[in-house]
């Protein structure tokens, strides 16, 4: 391999909203960039063993790879000179609600306008939509033409985005919003809220309305500002292909608490290069200390399945027998439900499996919400749950992200999972702080059975420990007859519930 001269300078020039040019770097500088943007492909089935995130012919790279080059240069003592666009923060007074313990929202707005492309990483309940609304307000005040599109990926988030934007702009005279949803495409307004599934459907070969398709393509290509909510779930190859149709963008904002997923190296690279990478981030720990998020503890209940007689090795079969239909495990869950009901704690139980959700609903009589529940009924059950004193609700993964449920005191992650981003998103449902609530609890299961179940449980445990610390995580063995009393004491002490707790709430 040819030796690279460390003293050579990398010269980078912004040539468009989406690309940098590094051809003025000289031979050694070009080699540095090539090395920085060449990665080993972790997939054993990949056509190529390496991934290159630069154009070898044009000597360009996408905007999101700049920070990777700067990090490489710092680690290898290489000089970097960047000739970038000079964006100033608009001289508009930022909303006064973004102050005090919410100062991070002001900082996020300012960081965005210095770059105009990138990801803002704020923990769940940190005010991502609030930040987007203020960025939108400034855009509407400083840009007298050009349209804004806010993309979500489910009905609940769509409805919540509309409500949040409407409430935010009420002090500014309101906001006229168009919709792209369930086959309906109204792009006549300056601001549009869309479901990505509807956009995909209209652009697909299944859509026979050529006029609608043509109008949507024209709208997307002429769009000036794109905002993608929960981008970690909205960056598949098919969705990125749609975003890249938007050649006229001058602003691009992505929102997420967990933009990059563990074990998804290739997809993370694709998201990074397209999005502009992270431009602002604040931690859950800081927001807890400021009182934006509630303090919380984690309780994990160990369930030992090793004595279970199960000869099948298929993972889906094991999941059904040992998790969804397990009398032992469901018995532990039912006892937990009984304890929390007696204490009057508002509890959300989250399920990955709708089948499991139905089983528990039939056993307990607790209402449930899933993707099969109509939009109106979903909102009605959610409102009834949040407005009630105490109470319980079962919900599928449609509630794992974005949905505002600040009144919830206890979250039970019923059927686990591996992905740390999902664990972080789920626990975010319970971390909201209100005038009457400043403490929360997450309850999960540690399933002891073969390598997959143990590893998945351990991964979630590590995610909790990394988030809140060892001292705030309790693990109880449900095989120990004293676990019920221990769990009661932990929950009672954390929420300051008296011994005669049925009369306390």
Give each language-model segment a name.
Residues 276-295, 307-310, 421-424, 432-503:
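A conserved SF2-helicase RecA2
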Residues 52-53, 75, 81-121:
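Conserved pre-motif I regulatory segment
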Residues 148, 155-183:
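Conserved helix-turn-beta segment of the N-terminal RecA-like "Helicase ATP-binding" lobe
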Residues 371-466:
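Conserved RecA-like P-loop NTPase helicase motor core
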Residues 225, 230-297, 464:
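Post-DEXD/H (motif II) to motif III coupling segment of the RecA-like Helicase ATP-binding lobe
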Residues 115-139:
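Walker A/P-loop
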Residues 159, 175-188, 348-350, 355-359, ...:
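Conserved helicase ATPase core of P-loop NTP-dependent helicases/translocases
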Residues 310-362:
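Conserved interdomain hinge at the start of the Helicase C-terminal
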């Amino acid at each position: 391999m040819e030796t690279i001269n460390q003293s050579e300078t990398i010269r980078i020039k912004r040539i468009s909203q989406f690309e940098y040019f590094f051809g003025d770097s000289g031979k050694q500088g070009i080699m540095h960039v090539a090395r920085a943007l060449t990665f080993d492909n972790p997939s054993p089935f990949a056509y190529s063993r390496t991934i290159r995130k630069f154009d070898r012919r044009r000597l360009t790279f996408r905007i999101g790879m700049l920070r990777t080059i700067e990090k490489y240069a710092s680690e290898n003592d290489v000089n970097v000179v960047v000739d970038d666009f000079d964006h100033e923060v608009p001289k508009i007074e930022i909303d006064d609600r973004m102050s005090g313990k919410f100062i991070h929202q002001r900082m996020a707005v300012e960081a965005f306008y210095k770059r105009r492309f990138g990801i803002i990483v704020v923990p769940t309940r940190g005010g991502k939509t609030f930040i987007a609304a203020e960025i939108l307000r400034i855009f509407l005040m400083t840009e007298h033409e050009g349209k804004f599109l806010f993309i979500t990926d489910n009905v609940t988030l769509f409805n919540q985005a509309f409500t949040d934007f409407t409430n935010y702009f009420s002090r500014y005279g309101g906001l006229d919003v168009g919709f792209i949803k369930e086959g309906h495409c109204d792009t006549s307004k300056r601001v549009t809220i869309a479901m990505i599934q509807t956009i995909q459907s209209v652009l697909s070969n299944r859509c026979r309305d050529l006029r609608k398709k043509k109008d949507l393509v024209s709208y997307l290509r002429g769009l000036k500002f794109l905002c993608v909510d929960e981008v970690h779930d909205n960056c598949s190859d098919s969705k990125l292909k749609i975003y890249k149709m938007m050649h006229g963008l001058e602003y691009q904002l992505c929102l997420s608490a967990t933009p990059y997923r563990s074990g998804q190296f290739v997809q993370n690279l694709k998201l990074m290069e397209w999005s502009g990478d992270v431009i602002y981030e604040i931690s859950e720990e800081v927001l807890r200390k400021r009182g934006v998020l509630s303090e919380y503890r984690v309780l994990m209940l160990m369930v030992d399945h090793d004595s279970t007689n199960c000869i099948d090795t298929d993972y889906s079969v094991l999941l059904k027998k040992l998790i969804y239909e397990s009398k032992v495990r469901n018995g532990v869950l039912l006892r937990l439900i009984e304890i929390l009901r007696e204490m009057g704690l508002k509890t959300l139980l989250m399920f990955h499996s709708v089948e499991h959700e139905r089983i528990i609903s039939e056993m307990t009589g607790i209402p449930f919400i899933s993707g099969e529940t109509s939009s109106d009924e979903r909102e009605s059950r959610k409102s009834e749950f949040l407005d009630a004193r105490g109470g319980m609700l079962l919900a599928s993964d449609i509630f794992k992200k974005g949905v505002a449920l600040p009144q919830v005191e206890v979250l039970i992650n019923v059927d686990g999972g591996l992905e740390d981003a999902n664990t972080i998103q789920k626990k975010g449902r319970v971390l909201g702080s209100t005038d009457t609530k400043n403490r929360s609890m997450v309850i999960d299961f540690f399933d002891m059975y073969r390598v997959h179940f143990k590893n998945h449980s351990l991964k979630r445990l590590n995610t909790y420990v990394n988030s809140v610390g060892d001292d705030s995580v309790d693990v109880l063995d449900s095989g120990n007859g004293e676990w019920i009393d221990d769990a009661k004491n932990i929950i009672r002490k954390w929420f300051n519930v008296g011994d005669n707790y049925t009369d306390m709430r």
